Amino acid sequence: MALTFPSIIEILGTLTFAISGIRLASAKRFDWFGAYVVGLITAIGGGTIRDLLLDTTAFWMLNSIYLTVTAVALLLVIIFGRYLIRLNNTFFIFDTIGLALFVVVGIQKTIAADFPFWIAIIMGTITGAAGGVLRDILINEVPLIFRKEIYAMACVFGGIVYWICYRLDYAPHLTQVLAALTVIATRIVAVKYKLSLPRLRGDEEVEESENSDREDSRQ
């Protein structure tokens, strides 16, 4: 693999996403092999789904560096695990960076395949978010993308910024950096100020609301 700017982004995204997956696996007391599998699925899951939808060979089947980078991520967690645990928001940091980088990778690869930009934004979102969905399923958690946090929408915002910069004919590197920073900034602002999308009300909440209305009417 030639070390171009997009390939560096992809490698860094693989490393950070793998660390986020392995970090959660360690919290669930997985063994080394299980942690490696979770880290690998986190790192390559979104890109694999993207490549299947784009009808191309999965990227990790063309180069073993992604398997190697995941092994490096496992080694880093094993060696520096105590420091990572002590560091506040370890998972959030690595997950957010990986999300931002993979959104850029997904958009860039889709554009290179001559798909329209709205498809590129969808593929960027899938590349960034789908690996995390698979990770959460493997560790028996509700996927982060389906909780209140703004996650997938951060990918969409990053994609829109990418499109705007692309239309304004910005340099490719600047476009990719600005799109990634948009994803990171959106996630940070959403978490800091507890911003979230509206939730659908469940049956229990509806019943509680109806009971409350009845009590109010009696009074």
Pin down the residues of each PLM region.
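Helix-coil boundary and interhelical linker segments in multi-pass alpha-helical membrane proteins
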Residues: 1-5, 51-61, 106-119, 164-175
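Structural signature of hydrophobic alpha-helical transmembrane segments
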Residues: 2-14, 58-72, 116-128
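The first (N-terminal) embedded transmembrane alpha-helix
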Residues: 8-20, 38-41
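C-terminal ends of transmembrane helices
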Residues: 18-28, 51, 75-88, 133-143, ...
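Cytoplasmic-side transmembrane-helix entry/capping segments in multi-pass membrane proteins
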Residues: 33-41, 63-68, 88-99, 121-123, ...
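Short, structured motif recognition centered on aromatic/hydrophobic residues
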Residues: 37-41, 48-54, 122, 126, ...
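Ordered, amphipathic secondary-structure segments that act as subunit-interaction surfaces
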Residues: 72-109
